[in-house]
Structures are given as structure tokens and as C-alpha cells.
Amino acid sequence: MDKLYSLQNGTDIRGVAYKDDKSDLEITLTREDVKNLVRGFATWIIDKDKKDHIKISIGTDSRLTGPDFRQACVEALTEIGVDVVDCGMATTPAMFMSTIIDGYKCDGAIMFTASHMPYVYNGLKMFTSQGCLEKSDLKDVIDICVAGNFVDGNSKGNLIEKDLIEDYAQILVDKIRAGVDSPENYEKPLAGMKIIVDAGNGAGGFFADKVLARLGADTQGSQFLNPDGMFSNHIPNPENKEAMASICQATLDNKGDLGIIFDTDVDRAAIVGSDGRPINKNALIALISSIILEEHPQTTIVTDSVTSNGLAKFIKARGGIHHRFKRGYKNVINEAIRLNEEGRESHLAIETSGHAAIKENYFLDDGAYLISKILVKAAKLYRESQDIGQLISDLDEALEDKEIRLKIEDKDFRSYANKLIKSLSEKIKDIDGWAEVADNYEGIRVDCYDEKGWFLMRSSLHEPLLVINFESDIESGCDMINEKLTALIK
């Protein structure tokens, strides 16, 4: 049972769950592990909420082991008296919503997913109505599993099957209709628009027919909507260059007004403009920031640490406050929540990875909700013969960017990285044309004036790696910065 600790990846459980002749990896997450983990989760809820009887919803993305793990979950939970709401194929954000929306209001929710990881992986994300379990909460669940202190049910729990995605999709449809509030065509505010969806064979295919088509959009030309746990076409990841190239080309080929791409479990997304240009990473943050700032002037936009100087300038020009924080979507979300609790208004927490959480939506990182928010604005602009990309026409984007990941051999890799960063901070003071950025919350960020760029050096969140991100506005600028930096840290 102790091995369960090694499966914890921040706020998630992840492991190798499937083996075939294409993979050399050994299975680390088994059916029995799943049973123990969900029993531990149920026990944790019962102990926390002081309830005798609870209800937990379960769902999966398109991964090959999803159905078997879902069945194992049903068996384990009903055996200890827990009622189970089987939502079938779902999305991670929808599973959270099952803890709060009428007709569900589950005490907990479990999503089987491993995000954009290769097909052999699977994992679990656990929710209550307060959101995804924190890292410390998940450890408490594993502690219960290791100790074997599971609750005993007096009677067998009930199994209820519900179409959560249908109900969740209707929430999005209603949101878009109300947001556009079209006097000409309230029911179908996207009529006339051509919108291409790429679900990457994950769980996001529903968005084309259950949301866009119902709103009048033409989605012909959409691709990889069918669930396929082998992810045969491309990795379902808005940060992946191949995936973005695929949706960009599909948008151009089909003369789309907009392209949309989701990751496997739909907690992340990105879009493509009618010109085929990707709107992800800094551009996506700029776009949704522009929309949020129209509704909430001067609000604080919390981002991760690797956002560009051009983005900071863009947000400031629109009257917003850019709070550049740490990597890790949970870090970014929790920071926005903290700022609000301190009286500093923040309506958006977003990572360059495409995780975006909006205050009005429970600070839930929800790719489909993010896209719905953008679609409301896009529909209004379409009626004025304008394109969504015009909102970020003045965003300064770097000529080049680069990321280097260096393996740290030292066993105490965090301590090693911290010492290296501290030493570098001292050396930077003697480098003409370089200046350490003062308001920085992760690693060290340095503006490089001669190279018209910057770099950020930090320790990886989960791996023994030193990660260095670069941007520059001149050709070969990233290499120039790296060459100078390498000489400093040798």
C-alpha cells in the first residue's frame, strides 16, 4: 500500500495503467489500487463531513482503462454503502459541477484521467464542492488507504446512471445564449459562424454537437471528435505544436471563423483565428484578459511565471493589474482566491498551459467554460463583421522563445536548484545589461536588455529538473542569452 504515495502527482493520482507491445513501461496503477483509493476518498469525506451516508459521482475520459477502473470504483464504493452516480464519459470540470448543480449535488466526485499523458497512463482527480482536493488532502486519503482504516457500510450502496455531459452542455448553451442575448436569434446566436473543433479523440467531442450545433454554428470539418484512448491522431494538448498545427490547418482548410482545441479531459483549451494563427499561451491569456477587463475594470489577472513582457504590457494598457505568480494551475488559482480574500479583486487565474479559472465559475479550470466565454464575445463581434483576433492585435509577441530542461543528478534536487539560483542572483549584479526582476515568486527572472529578452530559471514542480525559459525579440537572442547564462552557472 505504501506505493500509493509514489502515485501522487501534486493534486492528482497518476500511473501506468495499460501495457501492450508498444510500451516498455510496467503497470503501476492497478484495479486494486483504484479500489483502495476510492474507499479512502469515501472514508475521508465521511470523516470530514460527519455524514453516515454519502453519494459520489464517477466519470472517465476516453482512456482505454477507463471503463474497467469505473467498474472497479462502482464495486468498491457500493460495497461500503456509498451511493454511486455513474456519469459515463465526462470531463474533469463537469465532474466538479456534479457536486454543486441541482439533480446531482454529490458529496464527492472522481474523474479518471491522466490529462495529456500518453495512452498507457491513467489517474484520478477527486473533488468536493470546495473544488479539487489539495495536495495535503490527497495525502490524507492515501494515509487512510495505507492504514486500512476504511469505513464499513451497513448496507450496499445504490448505483444511479446519469448523462452528466448532457446536463453540463445545457449549462454552457444557456450561458452563451444569455451572454450574447441576440435580439434577432436568441436561440441560435452562433448562426452563420463556421467553428471547427478538434477534441484530439479525448472527451471534448460533445462540444461540437451538444453545444455549438444547438447554438446554430456550422461545425462541419471538425476533427477527432470520437473517443479513442490510443490518441491515434495527435496528443490532445493545446501546448503541443503538432496538435496546434493540426487545428490551425483544419480551420484554414474549412474556412472557419474560429478553431477550438481541447485537451483530453477538457480542463484546458486554446483557439485559432480565422487567419489560421494559433491563439494559445500568452495570446490566449491576453484574449480572455481583454474580455474579463471589459467586465471588471482594473481587476488583477493572476498568471504563471513564464508569461511574456508583452503580455504584462497588454494587461496594463487595458487598466488591469498583472500578478505574475508560480507555475502550476493550482498555485495560480489558489493565489487568485487568496488575493480576493485579502480584498484585492481578481477575476481570472490562468496558466500558459491553457488552464483558465474564472471567479464567476467557482474558480474552476474549465476549458469549455473558457471557450464559451470567448464565444459570447466572438458572436457579438461577428455581427459587426469583426474577428476575435482583433482584440489582441496590439499584443507584442516575442520573435522567438525557447525552453531548456536540465537534469539534476543531486538527490536533494530542490536544495541544489535553490543554491544555484541564489548564486546566480549574486552574479547577475555584475552583468551589464542584465537585471533581476524584483517582483518574482518562482526561481529567478532576469531582463536581458542587450538581447531584448528575458529568462526564467526555476526548479521543476515534480521532477529533478532545472527548467529555463527564454524569450527574445531579436534573431538568435535566446541562444545569446543561454550562452551567457551557461558561462555564469558552470
Residue ranges and their predicted role:
Residues 5-19, 199, 203, 348-352, ...:
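Conserved phosphate/anionic-ligand binding catalytic regions in large, soluble enzymes, centered on
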Residues 297-490:
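Phosphate-binding and adjacent anionic-ligand microenvironments
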Residues 119-146, 272-288, 361-372:
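A short, gly/pro- and small-residue-rich
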Residues 43, 55-121, 210-272:
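N-terminal small/polar loop signature for handling phosphorylated ligands or for N-terminal nucleophile
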Residues 78, 87-88, 92, 142-174, ...:
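Proline/glycine-rich low-complexity loops and linkers
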Residues 103, 120-254:
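Gly/Ser/Thr-enriched, mixed-charge loops and adjacent short helices
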Residues 1-73, 79-80, 158-195:
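An N-terminal, well-structured beta->alpha segment
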